Amino acid sequence: MKIKAYIPAIAAVILSSNATLANQNQAYNSNHTTSLHQAIELLDNQITNIDNLFKNKLPFYESNSIKSKFITKDKQYIIIMEVPGFDKDHIKIKVNGNKLFVKGNIEDKNKADDSNNYMNKNFNYVISLYEDVDQKNISSSLKNGILTITLPRIEVKEQDAKEIPIN
């Protein structure tokens, strides 16, 4: 996609760098090849300069999702999530019904200078809880960008089957 924006510039540089390249009646020789390589190198340098110009001006979070892991143990489930850059004030964990909601949000307007630098990183996970999760004793911790949520398990008593009469 990036190259599409540069196609008109590529054509202009190649054609203007050596007019004989556009002349089909001229014999092809090594001078043309050298000129073409020089034109491509010049274009590559210009593209690099343009990329460097915007490199640190557009901060963004280059991740489509948070890496997570679900571990099942005898007495608990453990959810481990990699959340680099987030601290505990940026993350909210809630339980509603049989769902666990984990939300993270960072909004940063760079106030150190008069620029319009702005960053927003966020994630939103909804996890369906098993019936044997003790929702009253769920705990969490955050250390070095690793969020650990511990879901204690309780014994679920099987209910006796009830026969439904047919009318």
Swiss-Prot record:
Locate the sHSP domain: which residues? 59-167
Question: Could you tell me the keywords of this UniProt record?
Answer: Stress response
Answer whether the UniProt record assigns the keyword Flavoprotein to this protein.
no
Q: Pfam families of this UniProt entry?
A: HSP20 (PF00011)
Task: Give one GO biological process term.
Answer: response to heat
InterPro entries in alphabetical order: A-crystallin/Hsp20_dom, HSP20-like_chaperone, HSP21-like
- Family of the protein in this entry: Belongs to the small heat shock protein (HSP20) family.
**Entry's PANTHER family?**
26.5 KDA HEAT SHOCK PROTEIN, MITOCHONDRIAL, HEAT SHOCK PROTEIN 21, CHLOROPLASTIC
Specify the protein name: Small heat shock protein C1
Native organism is Rickettsia bellii (strain RML369-C)
